[in-house]
Amino acid sequence: MKIIEQCETQHAEFQYVPRMLDIIESRISSDEIVGVPLITVKEIKLYGLNAFLKRSFDLISSSLLIVLLSPLFLVIAVLIKLDSKGGVFFRQKRIGQGGKEFFLYKFRSMIDGAEGLINKIADKNEADGPIFKIKEDPRITGAGKFLRRFSLDELPQIFNVFTGRMSMVGPRPPLPTEVKKYNEWHWKRLRVSVGITGLWQVSGRSQLPFDEMIKLDIFYIENWSLWLDIKILLKTIPVVISSKGAY
């Protein structure tokens, strides 16, 4: 207030740049009643009819993709079995909407028992925040490198979408160990169903700092529309083909 008053005495206009979190709180609008200024925080859009529309879109799209991609699933399964020992699929506990645990499925892209070796390479982590990422992860198999380059290892998550555990578009499902390190505001990203792809995945993928990923997730939640989901899915295609930021 003192700064504003000083500007007024100097006949200068006062302007300021809010924090990034203030900017993405796009549900905030200003109004006034009988001259009294009010700030309104609008409800998140993903409930009721909108939630029904999103789930319907997920169910239809995942059903079609399962049928259309079945031949590709078979080819990938054979490739994995020929390349290294272990199962075709890899399942991992993740945290979904509301903090609920579920099993996420992927095509196996690492050697069998890779999770047990994570402590040996923990000091090589290249990501900030609670996420663990290494560009040249020694646990990745030959076939796994190809699958990860084009995000083909993520395809079994379509079954997670079909069963209602995930959505086609939404925040990335975190590991339980990641959630333990969350700050309070990070939990906002788990107010909706987690997804296969999302806003930050088409805005830089693994190259983005952790907090920027979270901010993009929150922006998505607060500005959701079915058209936004479709746009993100369409933008995911060239991002996957270019393999930009994938590792």
What are these regions (language model features)?
Residues 18-22, 28-31, 89-138, 197-215:
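Short, glycine-rich, amphipathic interfacial segments at transmembrane boundaries or analogous
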Residues 1-70:
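N-terminal hydrophobic signal-anchor/signal peptide
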Residues 50-117, 146, 160, 226, ...:
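A hydrophobic, helix-centered structural microdomain
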Residues 218-221:
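Acyl-group handling in specialized metabolite and lipid biosynthesis
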Residues 1, 47-54, 137-144, 176, ...:
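Alpha-helical membrane and juxtamembrane elements of multi-pass inner-membrane transport
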Residues 130-193, 232-240:
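A short, structured surface patch at a secondary-structure boundary
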Residues 26-27, 114, 178, 185:
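Short Asp/Glu-rich motifs
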